A protein has these predicted regions:
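N-terminal and secondary-structure boundary signal
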Residues: 1-269
Length: 269
């Protein structure tokens, strides 16, 4: 589902209703993780991190569907306490009733095998992901210096302890490899309310940001990232073959890039 032209909460409410409501993905009594991008010490207007209003709405919907608890975390790049605070996500998540958990220590992560990985055969994954019943992946759509675009697949780097391995060993392949994790997100929600078009993933100034008012959601991670990447191309040219992890993900059978054959609902608000 692709929604355009609304505020983050309203777009998500519309999108999730098109997929049959959050109860399709979250069952009563479940422990849920909502995994935003909180990587950077940036305010929401600079589009470095997932929109906090969107995160709050998703958390509320999880509880409305009967979730027992909802946990929010990310393995940040900048100082984690500053990221959690200045992104607005910690306050928004807590106000909606979620627990907010850190990820800055290796002890939070446990080793997991990735038998289908090509370059990466194992990774240390955050215990919140390993211990939850279901998780929801909520990236922001951004330009990225290394991966060209960072969306849902790339957002998996925030559940992993050793990010350095990715950058030293074929980043695009490792992004696809981590998405072969057996415990896949039940839903991917791409925040394209504000898009960082240049100088990502950190960004330099407000001139890097475009108010695009988009949202994409799907259980298929490759499809949702392909749709978001095509949307990014309306703002700045970025051939999909330069975002190599999409095709590599399709090759590993974690989703499809052929979004024309899917029933994509496009909604203007």
């Amino acid at each position: 589902v692709a929604v355009m032209g609304g505020e983050p909460e309203a777009m998500f409410r519309r999108a999730i209703s098109e997929l049959g409501g959050m109860k399709q993905f979250v069952k009563p009594g479940q422990k849920v993780v909502v995994k935003p991008n909180i990587g950077w010490d940036k305010v929401p207007e600079l589009a470095g991190n997932t929109n906090p209003q969107l995160i709050a709405e998703i958390v509320k919907q999880c509880f409305a569907a009967g979730a027992k608890e909802v946990t929010v975390f990310d393995h940040t790049c900048d100082d984690w306490q500053k990221c959690y605070k200045n992104s607005g996500i910690e306050a928004a998540a807590k106000a909606a009733g979620a627990k907010v958990m850190p990820a800055h220590l290796e002890s939070y992560s446990k080793p997991v095998n990735l038998p289908n990985g090509q370059k990466m055969k194992k990774a240390k994954i955050h215990e919140a992901i390993l211990n939850c019943d279901v998780w929801i992946n909520v990236p922001i759509l951004k330009n990225h210096g290394g991966a060209n675009l960072t969306i849902s697949m790339k957002n998996h780097m925030g559940i992993v302890w050793d990010r350095g391995f990715f950058h030293q060993n074929d980043l695009q392949q490792c992004i696809a490899d981590i998405c072969t994790l057996q415990k896949k997100a039940v839903l991917n929600v791409v925040d394209a309310y504000r898009i960082m078009k240049t100088n990502g993933p950190r960004g330099r100034s407000a001139s890097d940001v475009v108010l695009a008012k988009g949202l994409f959601i799907s259980p298929d991670i490759v499809a949702v990232d392909t749709a978001a990447a095509k949307f990014f191309n309306q703002v700045r040219e970025m051939p999909l073959d330069t975002v190599g992890h999409l095709a590599k993900g399709e090759a590993l059978k974690i989703g499809t890039m052929n979004i024309d054959k899917l029933n994509v609902k496009r909604i203007k608000m």
